[in-house]
Amino acid sequence: MASLQDIIKERIKKIEGLRKLGINPYPEKTDKDHNIKNILDGFDVLVANNTKVCVAGRIMSIRGHGAILFAHIQDETGKIQFLLKQDQIGQEKMDLFEHYFDLGDFIEIKGIVFQTNTGEKTILVDDFKILCKALRPIPTEWFGLEDEEEKIRKRYLDLILDKQTKKIFDLRIDLTKWIREFLYNLDFKEVETPILQTVYGGALAEPFKTHLNALDMDLYLRIAPELYLKRLLIGGYEKIFEMAKCFRNEGIDKDHNPEFINLELYWAFASRDELMDMLEKLIIFLNNKLQEQSIWGNIQVPFPKIVFRDFIKTKTGLDCDSDSLDKFQEYLQKNNIEFEQQSSRAKLADLIFKQFRGEIKNPTFVIDQPLELSPLAKQKPDDLQHVLRFYLIMNGKEVCNGFSELNDAMEQKRRFEEQSKMLQKGDKEAHPLDLDFVEALEYGMPPAGGLGIGIDRLISVLLGVNSIKEVLFFPFVRQNPKNI
């Protein structure tokens, strides 16, 4: 069996051979006028009219020799067989194909379509040309590859060879399009805000730090677009959203990637309940669009609502309002759950919630979180230790976080100052003091509801895949030692 290097050397010789024949192995233009799906869908009409087609794609298989060759060509839309016959294209063209074309090469073919005796839809070729001569062969075996990280590193091969992978990413593209469609129909406007920020904020997370040489200034990659979007509410926009690439310098697992897409949405004059109602409609809309591709079937509405502290008490017996910090620490130690000693009672309660979150399978709202976990949310009028906030949990995962936005500038400054003290004590996820945002808030911001949806996580939940890595084209993986 030839080694990879031998195969590459042989293909380089073929490139040189093509050039000696006056053939460019990497031409710019093609006469392509159909994609493969067009041909398969309109096959009967094309046959009846004896229509000549021109398609371009990658050679996926070749069989036969001599006077007849069968092969398959694949483009973004599908795969179809093509037939080369010596009496159709001549000996010179047959020799050219046999001697210079390999699996993985891109080719343009022209001809008419017909159906073989076995019923396979086929293009009878009367002309062809090389579009790209590949140096490396496409692997013949891809399914069952044990090294998942290698599969991700070479996602391009995964897309070429695994129909299910391609299908998942096609659905991802559709889902983001449908989300925008849903929001546009409600008169939301899509906006863009800075990724490089002098003060990070909008979430409790550790940021990535970078440096702007031109101004000798340290900057952060945004962890969320929230504070800039709220500035737009202050500026007069009432219904806005952003599909924001965000970055968090935290753990990597099946639910987290250091960079991710977060849909953040703000709706002036809307309450938390109105926001939850809209979110329900969005989930139902996406589920209906997916039809049989969704794992959820008919989702029942309205989604159940569970109060955060009631959920904790039901699962552990702990009372988030009255039990001491020591009691929470004892529970975590007894159950071998790691925690940081400086963590507050509210943070420990949130840690406990995450331990039991996996038990919530059907779409469910968890509401009324502790104030300390929510420095940007409005307090409940009748319970100032809790806020008008919600999580949407689906299949044990948090896919959305939303709340009624705090618009009291003095209260916001006080909370930022409290968070800043926590940051100085070593809490890397505490919110920094952002006086520029406080100044903006002092000009007045309308009451508003806001939410953030982890798009990667939502898509993985709707499609029933186990990890967000399966819905990210290029999730973060360790660098291959061979390439270091």
Could you describe each region identified by the protein language model?
Residues 201, 205-207, 285-399, 418-445, ...:
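Metal-assisted phosphate- and nucleotidyl-transfer catalytic regions
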Residues 95, 101-102, 115, 265-291, ...:
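Well-ordered alpha/beta subsegment
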Residues 15-21, 25-274, 336, 460:
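Class II aminoacyl-tRNA synthetase-like tRNA-binding/catalytic domains
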